Amino acid sequence: MDEGNGGVNVKKFLDTLDKTKIKYIGKGILVGTLAGIVVSVFRLWIEKIGEILPVIYQYLKVQPIFLILWTILMLLCAIVVGALIKSEPNIKGSGIPQVEGQLKDEISVLWWSVLWKKFIGGILSVGTGLFLGREGPSIQLGASCAQGVATKMKAGKSEEKILLSSGAAAGLAAAFNAPVAGLLFVVEEVHHNFSPLVWLTSFAAALMSNFVSLTIFGLQPVLHLGDIPSLPLRHYWLLILLGIVLGILGRFYQVILLALEKWYGFLPLPAHLRGIIPFLLVIFVGLFFPNYLGGGNQIIIALGQHSPTLIALFGLLSLRFIFSMVSYGSGLPGGIFLPILTLGAIIGSLFANCAVIFFGLEPTFVKDFIVIAMAGYFAAIGKAPLTAIILVTEMVGSLVHLMPLGLTALVAYVVVDILGGDPIYEALLERLVKGKKTHLTGQRTTVEIPVLAGSKLDGTLVRDFDWPNHMLLALLRRGDREILPHGDTVIKMGDTLEILTDTTHAGDIVRTINEQM
C-alpha cells in the first residue's frame, strides 16, 4: 500500500515539473561542457605562449641576428591569419558583434568553419602578444559550439537562439572564471530582457563551463589582487569625478575605435592582410616592453602591487591605447574586453596617484581605484554597467566594492549617454551589416522584444499599435504565463513580445518597433 502511494507521489511530483525548463537546463549543461573544454584549451594555449614571449624577446635582444627569423615567423603568422579571415570573414575582430547578429537574424554563420578558424586565428593573434583579448573569441567559440549542438539536434530557430545565447555565456565564463557575468552579459548586452528559458539555459551553461575552467586553471580569481581595503565614505566624491573622467575617455575610445576601419582603408593592403602591420609592430613593443605584451592581465596585477610614477603611467596608458587600436583595427581575431579593463586599471591608478598628491587620498586606497576604474571604463564603453560590475567583482574575487563600483559605473554610463555614445558592440554590428542586400529567405524565425518602463506599448491594445509589415505577433509572455494575443489584448510593462517573421526582416522589424516604443 505504502509502495503504491510512493509511486503515485513520485508520478505527481514528476508531473508538476516544468519539463521544458528541465530539458533546456540539460542542453545548457551539454553546451557548457563543450564550450568549457574548447575555450579552456584556447585560453591555455594563449597563456602558455604568453609565458615564453618575454624570454624570447630577452634572447632576441642578446642575439639580434635571430630577429630576422622572428620577423619572418611573424609575417607567416599574419599571412596564415589573413588567409583564414579571407576564407571566413566572420572570424574578424572579437566575434561578439557576429554573435549578436546571429541572434538578430542579421548574420548567417557556418559554425564549424568559424569554430576551428577562430580557434587557430585567435591563438596566433592573441598569443603572439598583440594587444587583444581572449574573451571575444571565447564568446564566439562558445556560441559556435552551441550552434553545433543545435545543428546536430536539428533544433528549430527559436531553440537554436537559446542555445547560442547559452554558448556565449559559457564562453565568457570560461575565459574569465565569471559565470554570473557570463549570464548578465547575455541578458544585458545581447538580449536586453530577462527571458526565463534564456537565463536558465545560459546560467546552466555558464556554471558548467566555469566548472571545467576551474578544474584546469584552479580556484584563484583571474585578477587576484590580494586584500583590498574598503573605501571610506569621505572619499566617495572622488568616485563621481572618476566616473566623469571615465565617461569622457570611454566616449573617446568609442569614437577612435569606430574610425579605425576608415583609417586602415587608406593603406595599400587587402583587408585580410592588414594584420601584417600589428604583427610587425609588436616586435618593437616586445623588444622594449616584453612584460606589457598581450591582453594586459599581468599589468593589472602589477599595478595592484606597486604604483609607477605619473609619467610612467601616462606613457603606459598611451602605449596600451594606441597599440590596442592598431591591433583591433586590423581586423585580426581578438577581443577588446581585457584591453579595456587594462586601460581602465591604468586610468584608475593614474587618477588615484593624482588624488594622493592633490586631494590627500591615502596611498593604501590606490588599489581600490584600480578595481573601480576597470568596471567604470567598461560600463562606459560597452554601456552594460551590471555586466561590468559583476565581471570585475568575479575577476578580482572581492565583494566589498559593489557600492563604489555601482556609483562609478552609473556616472560613467550617464556621461557617455550625454555625449551620444552607443553600446560599442551594437555600433560594431551596425557597421558589419550596413549595406547588406535584403531578400526573403523563406526561413521562419522568432524575435523577442521586451516592453520596458515608459514604453508607449504599456497599456496599449494590440490593435491600436502600428505594427510593421512582414510580421505576426505570435505570443505575449507575462512572467511565466504565455498569452495568445488578439486585438483586445492589453500589452503591459514587463511583457515580452514574441514576433514571427522571415529571418531577413527580423533586424529591421526590431528596430522599427523599438523606435516607435
Regions found by a protein language model. Name each.
Residues 1-437, 445, 452-453, 478-483, ...:
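Alpha-helical transmembrane segments and immediately membrane-proximal extracytoplasmic
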Residues 453-509, 513:
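Cytosolic Rossmann-like ligand/nucleotide-binding regulatory domains
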Residues 516-517:
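Short peripheral tails and domain-boundary helices/loops at the edges of structured domains
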